[in-house]
């Protein structure tokens, strides 16, 4: 079907939860997408930070092709081939142990089971992290919240409140929506679950006051090192360090939502690592499996073991297909130095954006970038639509804010094409 036919059926049969742009993508390769007419687009959104290797990457395609011929799903009642190995990769990445992660990744790629078994073993004194595999970022955050509260009840301070930051985004379920401190998103679905406290991002005084007032009632603090949906707003190093210190002094846990900023998008395996902080729990999704639905809650083992069988679960999470995708993506990211490339490419993108006369601020790290337009420049949503006509895919998070989340294979040539087109459209609007 062509775009018009698909739009007609979409309007009849699909719930109206998204306002869609008028394009029907049919296939992609690398940084490029193609629509039903054959038109080519440069993708600077990557399915909202999901397709970290771009489109049609051979490592992912081969892994999925092989797995679909073998086994798709059997449920969590049984052991899943390579699931523990993927969890071991995540454990080593959580320790920022790139040498250990690469040794395991190369063993997995070689197909040498004994070498992989040996590489997966934790070294003496190594912090072990355990993983619960889910299907999405919201599910990963649900698991993180449940684990933090359960840990507080059984081993911590007995609290159940979770501190969240204004402008954050943690999902669309009722619980994660309650943690998403954006009134416009929460209002239609009141009453939401309770037990959440709000603080302004980077407000150290406000955070200290919150802990002084509520102290032992707090089970955890949930942060995004870089708030994505509100326009790519990084937390300061000082604020995150204070959050960690206050949480641990109160017997609470620090939870890092790495759904958008993690998986080497900002350089380090997880964005919080660039701030010199190790959290207690992390929520992952988006880029972890390159486009196959997959999420993960990763926690220090001594915290993760709070769960007992039957206290949390999933039907589809950690399926054979999702694990195969995650293994292929993680091995490629680890062995291919994608984090270093993301930093270099992101720095160049920010420099080019910052040089545009209508841009008032550029924010971000690596290939997670946002920029604000002058209020009298043009509407960001109109600009996104115009650039789509020009063959570029990006995103607006507000009337004057653009967001860039390209695949981690993005080159300086790709960036030049985009920014030149953006400059032309801004000049026309002015």
Range-by-range predicted roles:
Residues 1-430:
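Conserved N-terminal phosphate-binding loop of PLP-dependent enzymes in the Aspartate aminotransferase
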């Amino acid at each position: 079907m062509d775009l018009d036919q698909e739009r007609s059926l979409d309007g009849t049969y699909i719930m109206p939860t998204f306002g869609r742009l008028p394009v029907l993508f049919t296939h992609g390769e690398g940084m490029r997408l193609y629509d039903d007419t054959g038109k080519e687009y440069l993708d600077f959104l990557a399915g909202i930070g999901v397709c970290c290797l771009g489109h049609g990457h051979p490592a992912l395609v081969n892994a999925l092709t092989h797995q679909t011929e073998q086994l798709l799903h059997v449920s969590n009642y049984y052991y899943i081939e390579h699931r523990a190995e993927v969890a071991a990769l995540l454990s080593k990445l959580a320790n920022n142990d790139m040498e250990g992660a690469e040794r395991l990744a190369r063993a997995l790629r070689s197909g040498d089971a004994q070498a992989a078994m040996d590489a997966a073993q934790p070294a003496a004194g190594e912090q072990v992290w355990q993983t619960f595999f889910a299907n999405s970022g919201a599910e990963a955050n649900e698991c993180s919240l449940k684990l933090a509260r359960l840990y507080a009840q059984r081993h911590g301070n007995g609290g159940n409140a979770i501190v969240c930051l204004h402008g954050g985004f943690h999902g669309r379920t009722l619980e994660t929506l309650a943690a998403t401190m954006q009134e416009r998103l929460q209002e239609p679905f009141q009453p939401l679950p309770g037990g959440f406290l709000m603080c302004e991002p980077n407000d150290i005084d406000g955070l200290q006051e919150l802990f002084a007032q509520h102290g032992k009632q707090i089970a955890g603090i949930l942060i995004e090192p870089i708030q994505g949906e509100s326009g790519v707003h990084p937390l300061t190093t000082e604020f995150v360090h204070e959050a960690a210190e206050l949480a641990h002094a109160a017997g609470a846990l620090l939870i890092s939502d790495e759904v958008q900023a993690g998986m080497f998008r900002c350089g380090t395996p997880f964005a919080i690592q660039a701030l010199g902080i190790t959290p207690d729990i992390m929520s992952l999704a988006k880029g972890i499996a390159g486009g196959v639905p997959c999420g993960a809650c990763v926690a220090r083992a001594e915290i993760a073991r709070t769960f007992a069988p039957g206290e949390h679960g999933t039907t589809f999470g950690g399926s054979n297909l999702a694990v195969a995708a995650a293994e292929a993506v993680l091995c490629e990211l680890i062995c291919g130095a994608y984090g270093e490339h993301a930093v270099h490419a992101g720095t160049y993108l920010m420099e080019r954006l910052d040089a545009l006369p209508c841009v008032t601020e550029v924010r971000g790290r690596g290939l997670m970038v946002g920029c604000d337009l002058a209020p009298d420049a043009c509407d960001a949503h109109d600009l996104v639509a115009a650039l789509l006509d020009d063959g570029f895919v990006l995103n607006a998070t507000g009337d004057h804010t653009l967001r860039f989340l390209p695949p981690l294979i993005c080159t300086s040539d790709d960036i030049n094409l985009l920014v030149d087109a953006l400059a032309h459209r801004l000049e026309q609007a002015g």
